[in-house]
A protein has these predicted regions:
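Residue-level detector of conserved, well-ordered beta-strand and adjacent loop positions
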Residues: 40, 76, 93, 101, ...
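Short strand-connecting beta-turns/loops that link adjacent beta-strands
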Residues: 44-45, 87, 113
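A generic structural motif
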Residues: 70, 77, 87, 103-105
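Short, conserved beta-strand element in jelly-roll/cupin
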Residues: 51-54, 65-82, 120-123
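Short histidine-centered beta-strand/loop micro-motifs
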Residues: 28, 60-67, 84, 90, ...
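Short acidic-glycine-tyrosine-enriched beta hairpin
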Residues: 86-103
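Double-stranded beta-helix
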Residues: 2-19, 107-140
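A short glycine-rich, His/Asp/Glu-containing loop-to-beta-strand
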Residues: 25-63, 69
Length: 140
């Protein structure tokens, strides 16, 4: 089988898209300490990727938000800690999931060394925007 994504036309004109795990496609990421493996579903309609880290998160990501309608995350392996705009903190383990509305500020603060996460954004991710922490006085 080819190492390229296989596209099969359907009667509707849409295509089934297959990306074999044996030939992963990695995209440049928003963070140097994460690896972003793009999944077939990323064909412009949504962003779907598996995020991993080689040594665990060594520093927080910093407060940011994503330009999308929804961000769904599902922890495949390891752990993830993050702070949310509403003041809550979440500790996630394998099997946990979280749905964030687009534009919600958050900050990943730590991961385990074996961290692996499925992330889906609808519609596709249009950008990541660094921002001040919630409640900070932006006039200073």
């Amino acid at each position: 089988m080819s190492t390229e994504t296989v596209k099969t036309p359907l009667a509707s004109g849409r295509k089934a898209i297959f990306s074999p795990a044996s030939s992963p496609v990695y995209a440049p990421g928003r963070r140097d300490f994460f690896k972003y493996r793009q999944l077939a579903a990323s064909e412009g309609e949504m962003t779907a990727q598996v995020m991993t880290t080689n040594a665990g998160l060594t520093e927080p990501t910093g407060w940011h938000y994503h330009i999308c309608e929804s961000q769904f995350i599902y922890v495949l392996k390891g752990t993830l800690d993050l702070d949310l705009e509403d003041g809550s903190s979440v500790h996630m383990v394998a099997g946990d999931s979280l749905l964030l509305p687009g534009g919600m500020k958050h900050n990943e603060t730590s991961t385990s060394t074996d961290f692996e996460l499925l992330e889906v954004m609808l519609p596709k991710l249009e950008g990541t925007v660094p921002c001040d922490p919630p409640g900070s006085d932006q006039s200073k």
